[in-house]
Amino acid sequence: MTETEFLALVDQVLDSIESQADDWAAGLDVDIEATRSGNVLTLVFEDGTQVVVNAQAAMQELWVAARSGGFHYRYDGQHWNDTRGGPRLPDALSQICSEAAGVPVSVRL
């Protein structure tokens, strides 16, 4: 995948996550603020917990920084897979954001 293709894919992913965070705020009464700056999306929850999702174009990876640690994801043409064999990106973000929000939320990509 070219860098341009990768960045277009990342843009779609970050837009989707940001939109879903807005839906959680409206539909589930989750206190969350989503802020986007280029290829970095920061989610800030009521208790101050931050989750940062950012693109690493040179490595063609998405990185997630959360209280529980740092995670790297690579796209295989269908899924964003953890480079260390952990859960795929939507499952990991669902768990991380559910813990931060205090209610179950689901990330779909």
UniProtKB/Swiss-Prot annotation:
<dbReference type="InterPro" id="IPR036524">
    <property type="entry name" value="Frataxin/CyaY_sf"/>
</dbReference>
<dbReference type="InterPro" id="IPR047584">
    <property type="entry name" value="CyaY"/>
</dbReference>
<comment type="similarity">
    <text>Belongs to the frataxin family.</text>
</comment>
<keyword id="KW-0479">Metal-binding</keyword>
<dbReference type="GO" id="GO:0005737">
    <property type="term" value="C:cytoplasm"/>
</dbReference>
<dbReference type="InterPro" id="IPR002908">
    <property type="entry name" value="Frataxin/CyaY"/>
</dbReference>
<dbReference type="GO" id="GO:0016226">
    <property type="term" value="P:iron-sulfur cluster assembly"/>
</dbReference>
<comment type="function">
    <text>Involved in iron-sulfur (Fe-S) cluster assembly. May act as a regulator of Fe-S biogenesis.</text>
</comment>
<dbReference type="Pfam" id="PF01491">
    <property type="entry name" value="Frataxin_Cyay"/>
</dbReference>
<keyword id="KW-0408">Iron</keyword>
<dbReference type="InterPro" id="IPR020895">
    <property type="entry name" value="Frataxin_CS"/>
</dbReference>
<protein>
    <recommendedName>
        <fullName>Iron-sulfur cluster assembly protein CyaY</fullName>
    </recommendedName>
</protein>
<dbReference type="GO" id="GO:0008199">
    <property type="term" value="F:ferric iron binding"/>
</dbReference>
